[in-house]
Amino acid sequence: PIAGSMVLAAILLKLGGYGIIRMMQVLPTTKTDMFLPFIVLALWGAVLANLTCLQQTDLKSLIAYSSISHMGLVVATIIIQTPWGLSGAMALMIAHGFTSSALFCLANTTYERTHTRILILTRGFHNILPMATTWWLLANLMNIAIPPTMNFTGELLISSSLFNWCPTTIILLGLSMLITACYSLHMLLSTQMGPTPLNSQTEPTHSREHLLMVLHLAPLMMISMKPELII
């Protein structure tokens, strides 16, 4: 059920990050290199999750692995226990909660019309559902974390805090962000561009679907304009 995936990606996955934030308050500070293996493991896990996204053919699985990769960045920056790192983790968790839930919602609207989640079989919607393509574009751009979205603010704070703590981490961090952009654009092009399948009767988008997307993306845009609300 898509509702379960939306709640899982938007709320339950972020509760794990919140639990780590609370737990780190009782652990020693990271002035030593004691937590370096855990940070490298979290960043390497994010890179591997991103690489897994690149070879996915199932739309829902791709979005799920995307959520895992973003949580790897969150865990890495929480461990170093800096004010910028915690602010970036909070910003990215909230922003990606909206973004991943919106992507799952869009995946469900596509599945309702094509009855498949295979990427290559869901192409060609930009010709017949241009408004849905616009929602896909906005959600993917936010997943890539372009400025001035809250996703960009969170990743900028995370990058700055990790680089200041250990400059070598920028290699894994930069690789993760590069692969994120690659699979997000691949997902957009695979589901929206290309020829429309022949003999396919596609229902137009409904008002409830547009309302769902507005309720996902409008709060994220408003938070992006006033980030003081959460950081």
Swiss-Prot record:
InterPro entries documented for this protein: NADH_UbQ_OxRdtase, ND/Mrp_TM
Compartments, record wording: Mitochondrion membrane
Top class in the EC scheme: translocase
Reactions this protein catalyses: a ubiquinone + NADH + 5 H(+)(in) = a ubiquinol + NAD(+) + 4 H(+)(out)
Assigned EC number: 7.1.1.2
GO terms for MF: NADH dehydrogenase (ubiquinone) activity; ubiquinone binding
Main function: Core subunit of the mitochondrial membrane respiratory chain NADH dehydrogenase (Complex I) that is believed to belong to the minimal assembly required for catalysis. Complex I functions in the transfer of electrons from NADH to the respiratory chain. The immediate electron acceptor for the enzyme is believed to be ubiquinone.
Descriptive protein name: NADH-ubiquinone oxidoreductase chain 4
Lineage: Eukaryota, Metazoa, Chordata, Craniata, Vertebrata
Name of encoding gene: MT-ND4
